[in-house]
A protein has these predicted regions:
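Conserved GNAT acetyl-CoA-binding A-motif
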Residues: 102-117
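C-terminal "cap" of GNAT-fold acetyltransferases
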Residues: 140-164
Length: 249
């Protein structure tokens, strides 16, 4: 498999895997704008040359848009290989590229979000275990910080603000970033739907690194709360949201 490094110089002509439409699409534009500002902070985006979801995105943890402590670690934003491309070792190849790059840059290890059981948009814990990762911290909502250490130094951990996953607000409250392109499409859909149905809903866009690093949740790409309690990180479309509303009544 051949791989392509997406950079500030070629991002306008390269697709970004999870959103493959043209540059005028709101999801593509949102993600590309976000990426373009992250490259100077050390973000690396590597994708396969085939058209589809097969890529890894990582950044030094000190610049990651989540509330973690671990400045000498590299944080993996996303490692995604679509089902149609599984079974060929692409996940391992992409992970190894991240490991070797992190070592060259003097990092003490790499880390990524996962959970005891597979959750939407999080790394597969079985794959991480197979690759030698271990859990260094866990929040009250079950989201875990997994790490692979190159040296025996301090392990990465969640900031205290992200551990309890509780907020003092009623109704639905969504924290999200532009790291996930789907948010540019689906957050407005849920906002409009909630308004039409008189559902209490508030969306909080974490539009700076500082806001994301001090969020009340270990996952910031998409974290939905209801009456103060964490509910899900699964990106809601109209059907999913209505089903969730009915369930929580």
């Amino acid at each position: 498999m051949e791989y392509v490094y997406v950079t500030k110089e070629n991002i306008e002509k390269e697709h970004i895997c999870c959103a493959i439409s043209n540059n005028s699409d709101v999801q593509v534009r949102s993600k590309k704008d976000w990426l373009s500002c992250r490259f100077e902070e050390g973000l690396v985006f590597i994708k396969s040359s085939v058209r589809g979801k097969c890529f890894i995105e990582y950044i030094p943890a000190k610049n990651a848009w989540i509330p973690i402590i671990g400045d000498t670690y590299m944080y993996i934003d996303c490692l995604w290989v679509a089902g149609s491309l599984k079974g060929h070792g692409f996940s391992s190849e992409l992970l190894n590229m991240c490991i070797e790059d992190s070592k060259r840059k003097g990092m003490d290890g790499i880390c990524i979000l996962s959970s005891k059981k597979k959750m939407p948009y999080l790394a597969d814990p079985k794959f991480l275990t197979y690759k030698g990762f271990r859990v260094s911290d866990e929040a009250s909502n079950g989201i875990q910080l997994w790490y692979l250490s190159f040296n025996d130094f301090d392990l990465p951990k969640f900031k205290s603000c992200a551990k309890d996953c509780h907020i003092e607000e009623s109704g639905f409250v969504l924290y999200y970033t532009s790291q996930c392109p789907f948010n540019a499409k689906y957050v407005p859909i849920i906002e409009n739907l909630s308004k039409e149905m008189n559902i209490e809903f508030k969306a909080i866009h974490l539009d700076t690194k500082e806001k994301a690093q001090n969020a009340p949740t270990p996952i910031t790409t998409y974290a939905l709360f209801y009456n103060g309690e964490y509910v899900t990180n699964d990106v809601m479309n109209e059907k999913k949201f209505l089903k969730l509303v009915e369930k929580l009544k």
